[in-house]
Amino acid sequence: MIVAVGIDVVLVERFTRALARTPLLADRLFTEAERYTRSGNPRSPESLAARFAAKEAVAKALGAPAGLSWHDCEIVPDPDGRPWLTVSGTVAAAAVERGASRWHLSLSHDGGIASAMVVAER
């Protein structure tokens, strides 16, 4: 049963400027596994913007409670290389309160816009 849906869009150029303006922002928003590909290459600005949109979408699905940690919502590749959403800590606790135990994630980026949609299920 679906308990929540969240969606968010990010302007890639604006996000890229924010990362350039605030050097530690990427470390604050993303885990190392999110910032780099499996082969150790830095992720593209489009990929990071889509992952940030996913984190925002998760927060929206949970009702945007205060105190969520960005690192407690992680988008990493599954064994086939597709983006996979994992939650822990503050985000997992908020998910339990909301009755969410399974997540579905879709990421996209095109035309300078990154987007993400999440569906939370019981």
Swiss-Prot record:
SUPFAM superfamilies in UniProt: 4'-phosphopantetheinyl transferase (SSF56214)
EC number in record: 2.7.8.7
Family that this chain belongs to: Belongs to the P-Pant transferase superfamily. AcpS family.
One Pfam short name: ACPS
Domain of life of the organism encoding this protein: Bacteria
Name of the gene encoding the protein in the UniProt record: acpS
The protein, known as: Holo-[acyl-carrier-protein] synthase
Function in brief: Transfers the 4'-phosphopantetheine moiety from coenzyme A to a Ser of acyl-carrier-protein.
Lineage of origin: Bacteria, Bacillati, Actinomycetota, Actinomycetes, Micromonosporales
GO cellular component, one term: cytoplasm
Record: residues binding Mg(2+): D8, E56
SS bonds (residue pairs): none
Signal peptide range: none
Subcellular location: Cytoplasm
Principal location listed in the UniProt entry: cytoplasm
GO molecular function: holo-[acyl-carrier-protein] synthase activity; magnesium ion binding
Biological processes annotated in GO: fatty acid biosynthetic process
Needed cofactors: Mg(2+)
Reaction(s) the record says it catalyses: apo-[ACP] + CoA = holo-[ACP] + adenosine 3',5'-bisphosphate + H(+)
Keywords: Cytoplasm, Fatty acid biosynthesis, Fatty acid metabolism, Lipid biosynthesis, Lipid metabolism, Magnesium, Metal-binding, Transferase
Record has Transit peptide as a keyword: no
